[in-house]
């Protein structure tokens, strides 16, 4: 356990650290990538260029320091991060690298304010948190390896089918090269693609599993990512998957990870899934798995897209609507093309609104799951809050660094 002295010091310096948190995290990544270039491949460089990773880490540090006297409230965040760490192959030996560079970055930014007493307290606090992560991640690794067909590290898969879902989304159907069994996954989980690219070392990328959990294959559905900011590169791995990977090619995959999941066998109330853009992928897996396990389940699926050209899984959503007597779907285009509305390709034009959720879902009783781009997520979260939906009935997933939805 942490000493009372360490807790007191960390609480005292929290305002100062919070005021400089993003400066500290930017310096941290600069130092670490220079001193330990071997860890650079763990990090999505698009998120580095956009500043999203630095902002997310700054938020995590501030949250830990704020709640250092009651770390139990951080356990949901610990689970999310531990799952992500396992997906990337983070091991106990990586934690000292992070710790030493973080302490050095704090010293660089805070200068003389980072007294030996403060550095010692932050070091103890970091070590305490690192031990929590190492323990949880070890349990996840063990669980993955012990499943029928399970594995740690990477396993070679073959692309058995490649399907264009829209102008910007392509699906890849994957089976093990060794023809061995596939371990079960929880609807909503993701797998990690480990891929070499001419402009970067082997780069792990997480992609949600987008098909029913009962299928004899894994399916990922990849959006062709464009640069997030002017000087950043386009998504290297997503573009390589679209342009360079064909049926018959081999891909190295990590096992399923992730805590944004649903258990179809235990559903006891209506489920509402609200998807924006490529955020449809984990929710489609949830929907198909729920209906497969219980055809009479009450399910409401709202899918938002720009227009019919970029609307992925339109046919699958129509089939889903016919899969059970209590399945209800709605498609909303915010920038419909001429004919999209008239030809029935979408049900409504505009954005997801509080009124739409009120009128088309049992919002007073349902559990809500939503996923999509940050502005979409902020809007949906705000709508649910205005409708009085209890937070314990709301689950959501960001693609990329997880950030606060409530405050800009």
Curated annotation (Swiss-Prot):
Consists of two distinct domains; an N-terminal heme-containing oxygen-binding domain and a C-terminal reductase domain with binding sites for FAD and NAD(P)H. Its EC number is 1.14.12.17. SUPFAM superfamilies: Ferredoxin reductase-like, C-terminal NADP-linked domain (SSF52343), Globin-like (SSF46458), Riboflavin synthase domain-like (SSF63380). NADP(+) binds at residues 277-282. The record marks 84, 397 as: Influences the redox potential of the prosthetic heme and FAD groups. The record marks 29 as: Involved in heme-bound ligand stabilization and O-O bond activation. Its cofactor is heme b; FAD. It catalyses: 2 nitric oxide + NADPH + 2 O2 = 2 nitrate + NADP(+) + H(+); 2 nitric oxide + NADH + 2 O2 = 2 nitrate + NAD(+) + H(+). Binds 1 heme b (iron(II)-protoporphyrin IX) group per subunit. It comes from the Bacteria. Residues 152-263 form the FAD-binding FR-type domain. Belongs to the globin family. Two-domain flavohemoproteins subfamily. Heme b binds at residue 85. The active site is at 95 (charge relay system), 137 (charge relay system). Residues 149-408 are annotated as: Reductase. One of its GO terms (cellular component) is cytoplasm. Residues 1-138 form the Globin domain. FAD binds at residues 190, 205-208, 398-401. Gene3D superfamilies: Globins, Nucleotide-binding domain of ferredoxin-NADP reductase (FNR) module, Translation factors. One of its GO terms (molecular function) is oxygen binding. It comes from Rhodopirellula baltica (strain DSM 10527 / NCIMB 13988 / SH1). Keywords: FAD, Flavoprotein, Heme, Iron, Metal-binding, NAD, NADP, Oxidoreductase, Oxygen transport, Transport. GO terms for biological process: cellular response to nitrosative stress; nitric oxide catabolic process. This is Flavohemoprotein.
């Amino acid at each position: 356990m942490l000493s009372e002295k360490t807790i007191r010091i960390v609480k005292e310096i929290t305002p100062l650290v919070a005021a400089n948190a993003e400066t500290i995290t930017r310096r941290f990544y600069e130092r670490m990538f220079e001193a330990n270039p071997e860890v650079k491949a763990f990090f999505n460089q698009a998120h580095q260029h956009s500043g999203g990773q630095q902002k997310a880490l700054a938020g995590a540090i501030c949250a830990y320091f704020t709640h250092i006297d009651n770390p139990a409230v951080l356990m949901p965040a610990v689970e999310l991060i531990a799952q992500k760490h396992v997906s990337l192959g983070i091991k106990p030996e990586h934690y000292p690298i992070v710790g030493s560079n973080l302490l050095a970055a704090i010293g660089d930014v805070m200068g003389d304010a980072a007294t030996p007493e403060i550095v010692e307290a932050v070091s103890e606090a970091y070590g305490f948190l690192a031990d929590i992560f190492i323990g949880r991640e070890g349990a996840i690794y063990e669980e993955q390896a012990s499943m029928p067909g399970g594995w740690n590290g990477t396993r070679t898969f073959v692309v058995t089918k490649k399907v264009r879902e829209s102008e910007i989304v392509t699906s890849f159907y994957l089976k093990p090269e060794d023809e061995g069994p596939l371990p079960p996954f929880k609807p909503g989980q993701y797998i990690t693609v480990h891929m070499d690219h001419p402009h970067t070392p082997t780069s792990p990328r997480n992609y949600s599993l987008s098909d029913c959990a009962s299928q004899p294959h894994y399916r990922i559905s990849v959006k062709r990512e464009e640069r997030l900011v002017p000087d950043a590169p386009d998504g290297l791995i997503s573009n390589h998957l679209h342009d360079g990977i064909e049926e018959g090619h081999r891909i190295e995959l990590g096992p399923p990870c992730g805590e944004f999941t649903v258990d179809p066998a235990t559903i006891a109330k209506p489920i509402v899934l609200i998807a924006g853009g490529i955020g449809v992928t984990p929710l489609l897996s949830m929907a198909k798995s729920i209906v497969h396990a219980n055809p009479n389940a009450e399910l409401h699926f709202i899918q938002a897209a720009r227009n019919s050209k970029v609307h992925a899984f339109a046919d699958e959503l129509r089939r889903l609507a016919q899969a059970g007597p209590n399945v209800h779907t709605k498609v909303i285009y915010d920038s419909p093309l001429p004919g999209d509305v008239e030809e029935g390709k979408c049900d409504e034009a505009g954005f997801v609104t509080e009124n739409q959720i009120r009128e088309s879902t049992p919002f007073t009783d349902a559990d809500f799951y939503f996923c999509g781009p940050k502005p979409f997520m902020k809007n949906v979260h705000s709508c649910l809050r205005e409708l009085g939906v209890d937070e314990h009935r709301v689950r959501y997933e960001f693609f990329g660094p997880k950030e606060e939805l409530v405050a800009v």
